[in-house]
Every structure is written in C-alpha cells, then in structure tokens.
Amino acid sequence: MAQAPADPGREGHLEQRILQVLTEAGSPVKLAQLVKECQAPKRELNQVLYRMKKELKVSLTSPATWCLGGTDPEGEGPAELALSSPAERPQQHAATIPETPGPQFSQQREEDIYRFLKDNGPQRALVIAQALGMRTAKDVNRDLYRMKSRHLLDMDEQSKAWTIYRPEDSGRRAKSASIIYQHNPINMICQNGPNSWISIANSEAIQIGHGNIITRQTVSREDGSAGPRHLPSMAPGDSSTWGTLVDPWGPQDIHMEQSILRRVQLGHSNEMRLHGVPSEGPAHIPPGSPPVSATAAGPEASFEARIPSPGTHPEGEAAQRIHMKSCFLEDATIGNSNKMSISPGVAGPGGVAGSGEGEPGEDAGRRPADTQSRSHFPRDIGQPITPSHSKLTPKLETMTLGNRSHKAAEGSHYVDEASHEGSWWGGGI
C-alpha cells in the first residue's frame, strides 16, 4: 500500500522543533525523549531525523541517540560514533560534543558570528570557524543552530552556507533570480527585498530608481498636429500622484549584459517625456562635473550614483550601482534629477537627453564628425578617461551622465497618456 506523502509544512515545523530541543539540551538526546518533547509519532519523527541526517543537520552518536551537526568531507559537524560498549560512551561523548561555554563567552561568540556574516555575506561553517580562530566547523555548529532556532541566522539547504536571517526571504530559499518577460505594454516592478534579483532585457521606455516620472503624449488633434507636450502638474506631497513607497530608499545593484535598452533613465528623481517616435539627432551634453563615478574599458562599464533622498540612512549613504556589458543603449541618462524629452523629428536638436530643463540643446551646428557617435563622457568624471576608452559598450546613443541639484522626489509616479511599451522600476530592486 502506497504511503501518503508527508505534509511539507508539518515536516518543517517538526524539524524546527527537533533543532530547538537538541540546541537546548546541549548534548545527545534519546529518541524517546525527542518523541516526548516534539509530541510526534516515532515513525514520523524518524523519517524527519534521517532526512536531516542526510542534510548534515543532525547525526547519530549511538543507536537512537541524536545530536546537532553532521559529517562531510570538510568536517562540518561531529563524526558519527559507533559505540562498542556503554563504558566507552562518556569518553567518546566528551570528544564529540565540545564543552558548553559560559553564557558570556557564548554570547560574545554569537556576536562575532553575526558580525562576520553581516560583513562578509553567506559563508560555510568551516569558514566561519576559521575566521574566529577555530579549526573545525563543529566548534561553531552549536552556536549556528542555536542562532537559527532564534531566527538570527538561516542556512541554505543546497550550499550549506549560513547567512543572516531575513523574514522576507523565508520560504524562498534555493530559488533562482526573477526573470521578467515583457508581454504587456507596461510593466511595473516593485521588489524591496535586500537579496532580490530582477532580470529584464530588450525593453523600451525604462526608468530604474526611486522618485521617477515618465509620461508619453501621442494624442493628435483633428488637424494632425500633436497635442500639448508638458508634464502634468503635481503638488508636492500629493499622495494621490506619488507612489506608495514607505520604506527608505535602499541601494540597488543593476546588471545588464547583452541587452537592448532604448529610452532609459538610470538613477533617481528623473523625468522622461516621450512624444511619438524618438529622434535621430545628437544629444545635448551639458557641461559641468556630475557626481557620478564611472569606469570604462572596452565593452564593459560600471557606474555609481548616490541616492539624494531626504532623511537618514541607518547603514550609510545608499548608492545605485549599474554594471553594463555588451549592451545597446539609445537615448539614455545616468545620474539623478535628470529630464529627458524625446520628440519626433529629423536629425538635429529635436531629441534631448540632458540634465537641464528638458529644452532642446543648441547643437545644430555641430560638425559631422561629432555626430558619428552620440555617446561620450564628460572629461572630468571620477578619474581621467582616455579617448580610446570613452565608449561604454559596442553602441551607445544619446548618452548623458550627470545629476541635477533640485530636491529629490519622495516617491515614484507613472503617467500613461497613450499605449506604449515601457517598464518602471521603483521602490528598490
């Protein structure tokens, strides 16, 4: 007779209870005691225990006696002991289970573990032990599982790496990055988790950051002329127009590789106006020294833009880091508080991507040699950049780096006045 599959939720609860009992005991526990403490049938408890044994979470020290930790090639856990006689058990137990440290010593070690993982990210138990001056993972296993039972740490089941526990990541372990395909005309992506990953490629009309505004106006009058081209008026602090961003603006890591991105704004508090088809004219590059650091060499480039949001950031000033490799970018701005207006027209100053007020630039008299490539760095960004390294990617068009100084917006707003393809990322990636 086929056995019904176990309930994953109950198994997870039972596993947490087992870890808690073993942690509080501080020494091997008999199966009968586990049955009593966990209030579960012996058969069900055995199934969970042997599954946890395969996952190196617990191990057998003697028949029907369990303790924390497991064995693997790196020695991440106490070795299984085959006790030949009861007389040998005390000595072997002493060799397997380290002496219980005092409360102050244990608390200090937990603080060291937490600080190490916070500074260095997910690590295996052996690396943590060596960083704290110990030799084997079993020296810290008891502390790690005790901290896990108190929801201070969490462990990835596949990599066996320990990390700081975050409630928003609960139940999402071992999942791959979010892949979003743009099937709809407009995609609104708001993902606030600290370890969230979003992958998007070959899209148009994109803003990545906080406090952004995007509009598109392609409504034509009966005589064929275009309607008014202006941003809608928005009163400061109007909760009906701004987004519902509540959490402080956090840092963003954006990776783009082999992507086609047109009409893109990277940064915060930017405004984009789309009037029909994008122009083919050169961009107006404003003078000045925008506070955006950049490094470029060949087909790969990285940028960092500081977030100008009001208020304080408990973990220091957050930044948006953009890494691009082998991308096609057209009509793009990188920085904060920029305005970009894209209008239909012939080659000339009709298309603007700049950090000014969105007005056309006076570059109609530019020499033909200047219009061959519409992408370059201002000469004073971060560190000197030679002309041979001035291209970010194989092809960039209408590229602007820089910030404006006006006060940053406090939310993100999207206005759609006609059907178009676009994506808006706000509230943190």
UniProtKB/Swiss-Prot annotation:
Which organism's genome codes for this protein?
Homo sapiens
- SUPFAM superfamilies recorded: Winged helix' DNA-binding domain (SSF46785)
Q: What is this protein called?
A: Z-DNA-binding protein 1
Explain the post-translational modification. Answer: Phosphorylated.
The ranges of region (Disordered) come to 68-107, 277-299, 339-429
Gene3D superfamilies, per the entry: Winged helix-like DNA-binding domain superfamily/Winged helix DNA-binding domain (1.10.10.10)
Instruction: Name a Pfam family for this protein.
Output: z-alpha
Biased-composition ranges for Gly residues?
A: 347-358
Motif RIP homotypic interaction motif (RHIM) 2 mapped to chain: 253-277
Localisation: Cytoplasm; Nucleus
- Bias (Basic and acidic residues) occurs at 407-420
Q: What regulates this protein's activity?
A: ZBP1-dependent necroptosis is normally inhibited by RIPK1: RIPK1 inhibits the ZBP1-induced activation of RIPK3 via FADD-mediated recruitment of CASP8, which cleaves RIPK1 and limits TNF-induced necroptosis.
Matches recorded under PANTHER family? Z-DNA-BINDING PROTEIN 1 (PTHR14966:SF0)
In what tissue types does this protein appear? Highly expressed in lymphatic tissues including lymph node, leukocytes, tonsil, bone marrow and spleen. Expressed to a lesser extent in thymus, lung and liver.
What remark about domains does the record contain? The Z-binding domains recognize and bind left-handed double-stranded Z-RNA structures, but not A-RNA, the right-handed double-stranded RNAs that are structurally very different from Z-RNAs. The second Z-binding domain (also named Zalpha2) acts as a molecular switch regulating pyroptosis, necroptosis and apoptosis (PANoptosis). The second Z-binding domain is essential for sensing influenza A virus (IAV) Z-RNAs. (Microbial infection) The RIP homotypic interaction motif (RHIM) mediates interaction with the RHIM motif of the herpes simplex virus 1/HHV-1 protein RIR1/ICP6 to form hetero-amyloid structures.
